[in-house]
Amino acid sequence: MSAETAPINLTHHFLIAMPGLEDEAFSRSVIYLCEHSERGALGLIINKPSQLTLEGLLEKVDLALGREDLRGNRVFNGGPVQTDRGFVLHDPMVIEGAPDDESAYASTMTIPGGLEMTTSKDVLEALSDGAGPKRLLVTLGYASWGEGQLESELAENAWLTVGADANVIFDTPVDDRYDRALGLLGLQRWMISPEAGRA
């Protein structure tokens, strides 16, 4: 990155894979960026469900799902890094009266823009008790980029970026999330090509 280039921060943005991105893990992916800084980036793929259900995941940690509204929900392939580790992206859950709007869960990252990502088992225990966040997306694994790596991929036209909309994550059918994310840019799939930006 040159001294004249201002650093960009894409936290709480979507990365939308361009058609030319052939990496199996990321092809036609929409990734929600939980964190982006000069040190790198971390995100969760929001449109690639696995075969594992939320009930199945809870059973693996000796819990039962206590929420009928989540029955049948899929766990998502969040990315190729630490695929045995769970991440829960959700609306904020705060403890009323706690200092600095402390999160209700032990290991939670508050994401500027209004969402939280929790990695501790207590959020799963809350789901077992019939409580927990109203809207959530559970993944196994995550996507990450080292220093300057994402910026290089952006310069190579591997991704489109747009400010995230939580409704795309939580309220849009999985098969429509790619097109809805493109729609945030005023685009449709036919309008983008693998060679975008190249003469």
UniProtKB/Swiss-Prot annotation:
It holds the Pfam family DUF179. InterPro entries: AlgH-like. SUPFAM superfamilies: VC0467-like (SSF143456). One of its GO terms (cellular component) is cytosol. It comes from the Bacteria. Gene3D superfamilies: VC0467-like. Belongs to the UPF0301 (AlgH) family. This is UPF0301 protein Daci_1578. It comes from Delftia acidovorans (strain DSM 14801 / SPH-1).
